[in-house]
Amino acid sequence: MTGDELRSAFLRFFEKKGHKILPSASLIPDDPQLLFTVAGMVPFKPIFWGKVEPVYTRVTTCQKCLRTNDIENVGRTPRHQTFFEMLGNFSFGDYFKKEAIIWAWEFVTEVLKLEKDRLWITVYEEDEESFKIWKDIVGVCEKKIIRMGKDTNFWGPAGPTGPCGPCSEIHYDTGLNEDCSDGECTPANSDKRFLEIWNLVFTEFYQDEKGALYPLPRKNIDTGAGLERVASVVQKVESNFETDIFKPIISKIEDVLGVEYKKDEQKDISIRVIADHSRAVSFLIADGVFPSNEERGYVLRRILRRAVRHGVLLGAQKPFLHLINETVIEHMGNTYSELKNRKDLILEVTRAEEERFFKTISQGNEMLRDIISRSSKVIDGEDVFKLYDTYGFPPDIVVDVAKDYNLKVDLEGFEKLMKIQRERARSARNNVEYAKSQEIYDELAQKSKTVFVGYDTLECEAKVIFLKKSGTKYEAVFDKTSFYAERGGQVSDVGQIVWDGGSASVEHVFIPVEGIIVHIINVEKGELKEGTKVRLIVDREKRLSTARNHTATHLLHAALRKVLGTHVKQAGSLVTPEKLRFDFTHHKPLTDNELMSIENMVNEIILRSIPVITEEKSYKEAVAEGAIALFGEKYGDVVRVVKVHSFSEELCGGTHVKNTGNIGLFRIVSESAISSGTRRIEAITGFNTLNYLRVKEQLVGNICEKLGTSQDEILSKIENLIEKNINLQKELQQFKSKLLVSQLKQTPFEQIKNIRFVHCVFNDIESNELRNLSDIAVAGENSTVALLFSTSKDKVNLIVRVTQDLAKKIKAGDIAKYAAQILEGGGGGRPDFAQAGGKDPSKINSVIEYTRKLLEQN
């Protein structure tokens, strides 16, 4: 049975048991507590919590999942993976333990035809009900039902809070010989021999942030069986990587990198890492994640670069992973159409990140080799930080390389140095106050909703339904509002609230849970209470400016796709009253002609004064008509579509102008890279464009005045000044060089026996200048040793020269290595030429004295 056949058999089996087959959800969960979908139940958490009523009470899925908590084990064990597929069947208040257990046994014994005598069961030690079902109804021998503790047989939650419950696992006896200290081998004492193939979770509790358990409104079933793991049992192979799921990928790796699997265990580790990581990279990019230095993007970058690093260990000298990804897409694209639909994007982003990392490797490897050469047992955290800060060299790769040299890495020291950079938005995810606030709004959403009327009006009458003090401000919820909440990259409205005897300013608006709109307000006068009737007034000018920029963002997106190609996808955006910022997937900088074409195209649509149409329709209908849906966004059955004739059509809940002519004028002010494969354009519209052009015009006028020229002559004037400056710089450099040579020649040398010893200290000169001076120091001389230093406040560089007649007995490289120790740095080189560097210029005399004694001994 192939992996594809196994997947299909599982889904069809449960379909016959009354389950609805649902497609896999995205790897990007709609859950603020999780970076990725880590289990099959994640998409159903709101149902398990009792917050959302299920459309179907019985569901079965094959869910794509990603976990990186054990990434260092991937490739080193037969089972560990980052990306995997989770087979699962779910019941939402329908059947419970009895049916789940009976059906699981039926599937593994009758469909998969696994030998019953090889199957063992574990149950939670306090779950007597499950024990009896396995023993009395299914008929499993009592000695093969093992009671286990909470650490192994109580599942969840998937995050700090959430649904959880006892679980029962099916284990397969692989028959491997293993000494078990407790007597007979069982799943309780033998991880290697017994392979867990299916976990049946009986979800009946909710765990809060303190760890307290509360019964859920309904009892649920959540089961999970790793497709790759089950396939290894069915196909009777020792490793997930030997199944037909991985074979085409490993075969491609062999072809591309010229290696052979199962010939060398160290190489096999790297092959397995690449095979696993290529799947993770392909699916992450397909689901809208792009390499970056934070959150999901950082995880993708880490996985991708780890795969490349293992490719380098196998001899790769140029980008190769995108070629492996092609096989992933070909092999899995029929099951997961997003791979084929986004093939070009996956390959382009992968290749661009590979190219960037190969540059990083070549720069960082030299520094890493130097670090390893002077590290006896531990690589210092400061060195790891320098590698990351200077070259973007990932710390996990330093750890991998360190293992090859039996070195440890001071990751704790690295983390301390990284603290400032790492204090990002993720801290909010684990914030207890944030979790408490979420619970409050979850409860409020069960009783009340905020109706948004802001598409049609900027002012409305409303009633306060919830009020909470938050520092010096308040969080206020109304039964309806005209204020747009921050969402989809658009900032929230601001404005005023007035009521009888009072007023407040609205500073920010957000949506903590669906249906609740929270206003951050500053009470300026009077007292506001729950139940108070108020009037909400949106700042008209800021709303209109934001609307101009939002519609312009849609036009920019469409123009980018028309000029650059349909591989362009939105990777992020920010829409404010002042400007718009649009991040998109593209592998190289835009040319001046491309930018001009895009800008002209957008302005042409603006000048044509085309109506901007907004309408609601079904999601399927909108997508079928060609409307662009953004990766990672969650859409309901009914969506809002914003359309500009045949030029642009997107699913969007933001605010827009009624007519493109209302935008006025569109101007791109910058284009840059924010990460490999992702570009950013910033632009302005309306009066902001006019003000921008006025400032530019005034700046040009001021420059002309300073240079005493006209706008027509300004370019030639500047070119003349640049040429003069270059000539003056050359003259100045020549003068400086003469001074340095003069300083060197005027420095008296020491005669030690028959050896001419030259040593001279210069103040903060370039390394190439120091090298030139060292050439002069030994030019036309024999029996000469020269030490030339360049110092700055906390840095010293040294060049050591030894003439050829002395180089066999006095080696420049040895002097440099010793000098590096004294100067607290690193160094080395050839017998006739060597360099060293350090951070303690005060030790220069010690280096000179050491060399003097060395010469006296020869």
Curated annotation (Swiss-Prot):
| Binding-site residues, Zn(2+) | 550, 554, 652, 656
**What does the note under cofactor report?**
Binds 1 zinc ion per subunit.
Q: Which UniProt keywords apply?
A: Aminoacyl-tRNA synthetase, ATP-binding, Cytoplasm, Ligase, Metal-binding, Nucleotide-binding, Protein biosynthesis, RNA-binding, tRNA-binding, Zinc
Q: Cite the InterPro entries for this sequence.
A: aa-tRNA-synth_II/BPL/LPL (IPR045864), Ala-tRNA-lgiase_IIc (IPR002318), Ala-tRNA-ligase_IIc_anticod-bd (IPR018162), Ala-tRNA-synth_IIc_core (IPR018165), Ala-tRNA-synth_IIc_N (IPR018164), Ala-tRNA_ligase (IPR050058), Ala_tRNA_ligase_euk/bac (IPR023033), DHHA1_dom (IPR003156)
Q: Where in the cell is it found?
A: Cytoplasm
Which catalytic reaction applies to this protein?
A: tRNA(Ala) + L-alanine + ATP = L-alanyl-tRNA(Ala) + AMP + diphosphate
What is a single Pfam family found in this protein's UniProt entry?
tRNA-synt_2c
Q: Which domain of life is it from?
A: Bacteria
Q: What does this protein do?
A: Catalyzes the attachment of alanine to tRNA(Ala) in a two-step reaction: alanine is first activated by ATP to form Ala-AMP and then transferred to the acceptor end of tRNA(Ala). Also edits incorrectly charged Ser-tRNA(Ala) and Gly-tRNA(Ala) via its editing domain.
Name the UniProt record assigns to this protein = Alanine--tRNA ligase
